[in-house]
């Protein structure tokens, strides 16, 4: 929930909390998207060294740090720096979460599309719940900073489930039908 919520509401945060004009917000989105390319390669390299699960746990801790840092951001340049970090872990977490999920699909199945449809559905539900919670906290407290800080709770829940995840050991990659 937290990752998608941060990605969807980053520009809104910059607008409401920092008063950034549209051209600076567009630059922020470009920074995030371009850096995400490098982030996906970086975390692919890291996952070869420490494994998918440990890489995901590392990225979730970085996401928690991003949420805490967002609470304290006061300048456009701090926001750009945070956007750089968001892009780096966004690219990594999107690619590694899908590849890790693929490892959980039973090797005997030929219907991979159904599994990934479920993955996409849960992602969309997470966006709705995360955005609702973000808005609800903003309404209660009057600040998007508190909402960003509250997103740490979602990442803590994610760490809880990741810690219990056991990835199957496979000699070879599953064959796709």
What are these regions (language model features)?
Residues 38-52, 138:
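Helix-to-loop junctions at the C-terminal end of transmembrane segments
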